[in-house]
Structures are given as structure tokens and as C-alpha cells.
């Protein structure tokens, strides 16, 4: 399989010694531990392959645990009931917590989070898990477990909230791509913050655009063309905004950072402040599909 390159790969090439402010001291110490000339045992071939496919692969990673839970939820929902082979029935997805706005309006706010563990078919879960692992290990390593967990689930909540507000009637959404777009958002933020000192800007931009286009193409082909655009937008905005706040200690920040940081806080506050009143107070005049219940 051809290796899909991410922002982290190119930044590592640009700054091979990893003396970039985006790598914190804890990350640096792990790097030196893993590459020291001491008595560290050589890695096995399977681990090396996984690290090639998923940079900074680690068994002790929250993104790996989340991905395992994704597969468990998918297997359970398929075993309970299917509409077609390997496609969970819609009523099963609703009972497990799918993003179904009429029920969110009734107070079932957990439906803003649980859809991140549910998927519509085999290719849907495979694709989302692959790309969140492809990006997630590096991001988790850079920011740490707690910050990564906050980024991941906040992006999922913001994405599902914007989706539920925009597509209220006859809308049933599931998938980890809301959180996945949050990971893309923080990588775009990193690229923007370090753009002025990158040596290979054209290559960085080309690979990022190619990566996003490939992801969108696969979504349309493997998920039947049913794309939650607003969910992706919400996750992307959340990830980008959180990235601005996570990198406030970055050295040599662009001159526009104070305004961008203020805008990021504004987005994180304004989106729920606008969406919740619309979601709960505005009568959409649509009927709940009782076949889902």
C-alpha cells in the first residue's frame, strides 16, 4: 500500500532534529529514549511495519483504544440487525446513540458524542479508523493523552451539534469523521503557525491538499455519497481553534497570532451559543420517523 503522507512527516523532514516548539519537552525525551544507543532491543518487523503505516504507533495510545471501541460497536450493531450485509439497521444505530436531532431536542444530548463510535457499513468504519490512526498517533504523541482526548471528543461534539442544527429533519448521522476532521483542523493550524519558517512549503501544501482530496474521494466512493458536510465543518473548525489554543507557548509565532487566538475562542464559544437555541427553540415542522424508534 502506498504511504499516505501527513503534515507531521514533512515537518519531521524540515526539522530533522525535532527542535521545533511544536514538539514539547516530554515528546523530546521520548524521542531520545527510543533512539539512544543504549541497550534498547530492536523492534520486530510487525512493529516496524505498523510504524511505517501509522507514524509513532504505540500500543499505549488512546487513539488505538478508541479505534478498537469503534470496531466493537460496529460488530455488535451488525450482529444485532442488518438492512443489507455488513450494514447495521437504522433503528439499531438510533438505539445505540446515533445523531438523530428530534431525540436530541428531547434532551438526549449524549447523541452529540456517541455517534463517533457508530458507523454505517464496513468500509465506513475501516476508512475512518485507518485515517484517525494515520494522523492520531503523531498528534497524541505531540500534545499528550489528555489534550488529544479533549481535541478528539470536542471535535466530535461540535461536528455533531452543527450537523444536528443544520440537518434537523430526516437526518440520521454516525461516524468518527467529525473527530477525524478535528485532527485535520489541528494539522492545518500547525501548518499556518509554522508557515513562515518552513523550507518546503510547496511540498507541504501539495501533500496536505492531496491528503484531504483523497479522503473526500474515498468518503464519496466508500460511504455511498452520504456525506455529513456540516459535521465535518464543525469538527474542522473545532480542531483548528483548539490548535490555536494548544500552541500558545509556541516560539516565533506569526504576528497575527493574537487575533487568530481571539477568533478561535470566539468560534468555540459562538458555535454552541448559536446552535443550541436553534436546535431546541426553533420549530422545524417536521415529523419524527417512528420507524427509527
From Swiss-Prot:
User: Quick check: keyword Hydrolase in the entry?
Assistant: yes
Provide the top EC class.
Answer: hydrolase
Membrane-crossing ranges are 62-82, 112-132, 148-168, 174-194, 217-237, 262-282
Q: Where in the cell is it found?
A: Cytoplasmic vesicle, Secretory vesicle, Microneme membrane
Q: Name one GO cellular component term.
A: cytoplasmic vesicle
Q: Which UniProt keywords apply?
A: Cytoplasmic vesicle, Hydrolase, Membrane, Protease, Serine protease, Transmembrane, Transmembrane helix
EC number(s): the record gives 3.4.21.105
Catalytic activities: Cleaves type-1 transmembrane domains using a catalytic dyad composed of serine and histidine that are contributed by different transmembrane domains
Cross-referenced Gene3D superfamilies, in alphabetical order? Rhomboid-like
Active site: residue positions: 177, 232
The record's similarity note reads:
Belongs to the peptidase S54 family.
Could you identify this protein by its name? Rhomboid-like protease 1
Organism in which the protein naturally occurs: Toxoplasma gondii
Amino acid at each position: 500500500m502506498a504511504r499516505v503522507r501527513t503534515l507531521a512527516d514533512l515537518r519531521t523532514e524540515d526539522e530533522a532534529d525535532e527542535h521545533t516548539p511544536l514538539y514539547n519537552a516530554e515528546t523530546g525525551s521520548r524521542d531520545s529514549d527510543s533512539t539512544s544507543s543504549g541497550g534498547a532491543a530492536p523492534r520486530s518487523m510487525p512493529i516496524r511495519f505498523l510504524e511505517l503505516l501509522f507514524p509513532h504507533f504505540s500500543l499505549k495510545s488512546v487513539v488505538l483504544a478508541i479505534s478498537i471501541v469503534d470496531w466493537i460497536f460496529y460488530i455488535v450493531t451488525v450482529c444485532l440487525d442488518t438492512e443489507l450485509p455488513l450494514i447495521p439497521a437504522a433503528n439499531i444505530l438510533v438505539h445505540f446513540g446515533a445523531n438523530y436531532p428530534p431525540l436530541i431536542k428531547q434532551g438526549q444530548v449524549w447523541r452529540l458524542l456517541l455517534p463517533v463510535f457508530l458507523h454505517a457499513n464496513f468500509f465506513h468504519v475501516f476508512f475512518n479508523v485507518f485515517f484517525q490512526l494515520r494522523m492520531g498517533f503523531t498528534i497524541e504523541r505531540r500534545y499528550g493523552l489528555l489534550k488529544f482526548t479533549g481535541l478528539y471528543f470536542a471535535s466530535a461534539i461540535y461536528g455533531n451539534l452543527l450537523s444536528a442544527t443544520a440537518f434537523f429533519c430526516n437526518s440520521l448521522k454516525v461516524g468518527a469523521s467529525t473527530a477525524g476532521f478535528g485532527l485535520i483542523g489541528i494539522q492545518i493550524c500547525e501548518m499556518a503557525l509554522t508557515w513562515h519558517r518552513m523550507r518546503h512549503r510547496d511540498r507541504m501544501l501539495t501533500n496536505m491538499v492531496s491528503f484531504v482530496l483523497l479522503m473526500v474521494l474515498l468518503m464519496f466512493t466508500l460511504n455511498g455519497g452520504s456525506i455529513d458536510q456540516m459535521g465535518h465543518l464543525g469538527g474542522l473548525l473545532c480542531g483548528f481553534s483548539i490548535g490555536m489554543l494548544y500552541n500558545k507557548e509556541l516560539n516565533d509565532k506569526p504576528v497575527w497570532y493574537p487575533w487568530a487566538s481571539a477568533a478561535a475562542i470566539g468560534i468555540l464559544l459562538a458555535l454552541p451559543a448559536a446552535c443550541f437555541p436553534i436546535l431546541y427553540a426553533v420549530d422545524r415542522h417536521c415529523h419524527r420517523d417512528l420507524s427509527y424508534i
